[in-house]
């Protein structure tokens, strides 16, 4: 790694020259800031003060390794090994999808809706890193939160994050498409279900960023072209059995499938269906409520 001096200023210069074809200047600035805060174990305020301080050889090796990985378009959250989600510092690596800001918006919605609910029972299906369930638990400590995930890799990360945040979740391995995997749940026992399931049709793979395809777990992203609503349909059908009357179901959705989702949920008998856009103006979240009677399982 060629730097003229062992200082952060030089690291910034070098990163900009090496990565400008892959990242914007502001992205590079953010990456360096996050890497430095983690490496030197300093606060964001202290970061402003260290730009001319001398770095050790091991520090330089750390930045060089990060640069190599960034050149290969590995997400910098995986390089850091952690991500902030709703004031929680979560461990993150290629075992699970990187939590996105849009998902924080979904948590916001649920938090607002449940604020007057005492001890709500919540289930997060296809939980991944556990970001939704853990954020909701941190916001409503009196809640009973469950998290279900099928991937063994994601489950191990979910357990690590539960321990890391000192929060309690009921965690289970569950294939949401398998009828038998719901048998341990009690009917009419949940106030809220939430899921951010795989929702990108395989045909859209070519539209995805290369770093997502190369590093993030594809089983958490893609569904078969012939049935892109499969996860939503099965989860919604089961929600009718396991949600309490007037229980609420929340989904993160594919903006191209809004109309199909509305048709699906209305057809199943859900009421008070609402769609919300994310900060980019795309349909991203959906909410539906059960009526005062339930289907039989």
Question: Positions of the model-derived regions?
Answer:
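A general structural signal for well-ordered alpha-helical segments in protein cores
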Residues: 12, 32-33, 63, 76, ...
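N-terminal auxiliary segments of SAM/dcSAM-dependent transferases
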Residues: 2-80
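SAM-dependent Rossmann-like transferase core, predominantly class I methyltransferases
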Residues: 49-51, 64-141, 145-160, 287
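Short, glycine- and charge-enriched coil/turn segments that flank and shape catalytic ligand pockets
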Residues: 56-61, 112-121, 142, 178-188, ...
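Flexible, glycine-/basic-rich loop-and-beta segments that form/coincide
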Residues: 292-297
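S-adenosylmethionine
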Residues: 143, 148-290
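Alpha-helical elements of Rossmann-like donor-binding domains used by nucleotide-donor carbohydrate transfer enzymes
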Residues: 14, 34, 62-65, 105, ...
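Short, solvent-exposed loop/helix junctions and linker helices
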Residues: 5, 9, 22, 56-60, ...
